[in-house]
A protein has these predicted regions:
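Aromatic- and Gly/Pro-rich donor/ligand-binding loops
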Residues: 3-14, 18-155
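A nucleotide-sugar donor-handling region in carbohydrate enzymes
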Residues: 87-101, 112, 137-209, 215-216
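Single conserved hydrophobic/aromatic residue that forms the stacking wall/gate
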Residues: 219-228
Length: 228
């Protein structure tokens, strides 16, 4: 059995990598005899905006040493990213079909975010209607009930063999877009235990108690909040 995962595997942030890793490892556990691969489809516009954002030198914030450290971190991140097996590079639905996959999994991450630069009908299954395709816990991100739904996502959503989302807004979107009821499913980052990876990389626990806040935007935290 050959399984392909269509997701934002090329996006350089921790959440994107962890959901891909969680999905890959979970599918390998469920189907140990299967060949599981990430479908190497890259939306070039999305990739460029992401990488430019990372490599941008911020005057007054970055210094030469912090910028060098940023590049080092990017190289380390890319090493882990590429540890997940992927297919040959594909650019169209036909090229994905030519991979002759037995199952295509769409998700998770914000692959259904109509408002972002990563939008493409392919991520909704459009062009893959005759393939065995399911959507596992994708998200619409910033999409709301007021967001217009492009007609070219309808066919893909309508023909998915199974359909789910990871949040309420995604379930609402599916019903509004194609009239189907989607199931709410757990994000794949919660399906896989990363402890073995942490141990293998010899990552030591911090010698103090802390709360980790992961956010893609810079949020001002007041001093009283910081102290508490």
């Amino acid at each position: 059995m050959r399984i392909g995962i269509l997701t934002h595997h090329y996006v350089k942030n921790y959440g994107a990598f962890l959901q891909m890793k969680g999905m890959y490892e979970t599918l390998q556990r469920l189907y140990p005899e299967a060949e599981v691969r990430v479908i190497n489809y890259v939306n070039q516009k999305h990739w460029r905006r992401n990488i430019i954002h990372i490599l941008h030198f911020r005057p007054g914030v970055d210094t030469l040493s912090t910028y060098v450290e940023k590049i080092r971190q990017l190289r380390t991140f890319t090493k882990y990213e590429r540890s997940i097996p992927r297919t040959r590079s594909v650019k169209t639905a036909k090229e994905i079909i030519d991979l002759k996959l037995d199952l295509i999994v769409l998700g998770s991450d914000e692959i259904w975010n109509l408002c972002g630069s990563g939008y493409h009908p392919l991520k909704f299954g459009t062009g893959l209607e005759n393939q065995r395709t399911i959507a596992y816990a994708p998200s619409v991100g910033a999409v709301t009930e007021e967001t217009a739904v492009p007609e070219d996502v309808f066919s893909g959503l309508k023909h998915l063999d199974r359909i789910s989302g990871r949040d309420v807004e995604s379930l609402k979107f599916v019903e509004r877009a194609c009239g189907r009821k989607a199931e709410k499913m757990l994000d794949p980052t919660f399906l896989y235990n990363f402890d073995m990876d942490i141990e293998r990389e010899n990552i030591k626990p911090k010698p103090y108690r802390y709360i980790l806040i992961y956010d893609l935007s810079l949020i001002h935290i007041s001093e009283p909040t910081r102290r508490s």
